[in-house]
């Protein structure tokens, strides 16, 4: 069979020509491949480290933004609470003043009511006196008329 035909067992040796060294890995080629591999690994590590730093920076920015956003709400709630506390104190003071004023009004109304009762008592007393005086006046008039009629003229 002819070399290169199908029936022939192919081997690397049989295809080499005389004087060609056997294929052994070239040390410089392996060294170059190793350096390329290490360079690629270093590039990947640097890229990964860069991405990690970017992710940390982005996470930090996000965290700060969220905290700032929450702090705005918390600050607003705190301000609202302070306003409410102030309004409660003001309302308590006003309620106390109103209660005091109401007590004064009640006292004045009671005094006025007592004065009206006293005026009513005085009015009743005056009517009673007036009635007594009329009775006395009528009696005196009756006696006086009786004396005039019985006296000789």
Swiss-Prot record:
Region (Disordered): 1-27
Record localization: Mitochondrion intermembrane space; Mitochondrion matrix; Cytoplasm, Cytosol; Lysosome membrane
One record GO biological process: peptidyl-lysine acetylation
Gene Ontology molecular function: protein-lysine-acetyltransferase activity
Any GO CC annotation of this UniProt entry: cytosol
Superkingdom classification of source: Eukaryota
Coiled-coil intervals, chain numbering: 27-59
EC number of this enzyme: 2.3.1.-
Compositionally biased residues, Basic and acidic residues: 1-11
Signal peptide: none
Keywords annotated in UniProt: Coiled coil, Cytoplasm, Lysosome, Membrane, Mitochondrion, Transferase
Catalyzed reactions per annotation: L-lysyl-[protein] + acetyl-CoA = N(6)-acetyl-L-lysyl-[protein] + CoA + H(+)
Protein family membership: Belongs to the BLOC1S1 family.
Function: Component of the BLOC-1 complex, a complex that is required for normal biogenesis of lysosome-related organelles (LRO), such as platelet dense granules and melanosomes. In concert with the AP-3 complex, the BLOC-1 complex is required to target membrane protein cargos into vesicles assembled at cell bodies for delivery into neurites and nerve terminals. The BLOC-1 complex, in association with SNARE proteins, is also proposed to be involved in neurite extension. As part of the BORC complex may play a role in lysosomes movement and localization at the cell periphery.
Assembly and interaction partners: Component of the biogenesis of lysosome-related organelles complex 1 (BLOC-1) composed of BLOC1S1, BLOC1S2, BLOC1S3, BLOC1S4, BLOC1S5, BLOC1S6, DTNBP1/BLOC1S7 and SNAPIN/BLOC1S8. Octamer composed of one copy each BLOC1S1, BLOC1S2, BLOC1S3, BLOC1S4, BLOC1S5, BLOC1S6, DTNBP1/BLOC1S7 and SNAPIN/BLOC1S8. The BLOC-1 complex associates with the AP-3 protein complex and membrane protein cargos. Component of the BLOC-one-related complex (BORC) which is composed of BLOC1S1, BLOC1S2, BORCS5, BORCS6, BORCS7, BORCS8, KXD1 and SNAPIN.
Protein name stated in the entry: Biogenesis of lysosome-related organelles complex 1 subunit 1
Source species: Homo sapiens (Human)
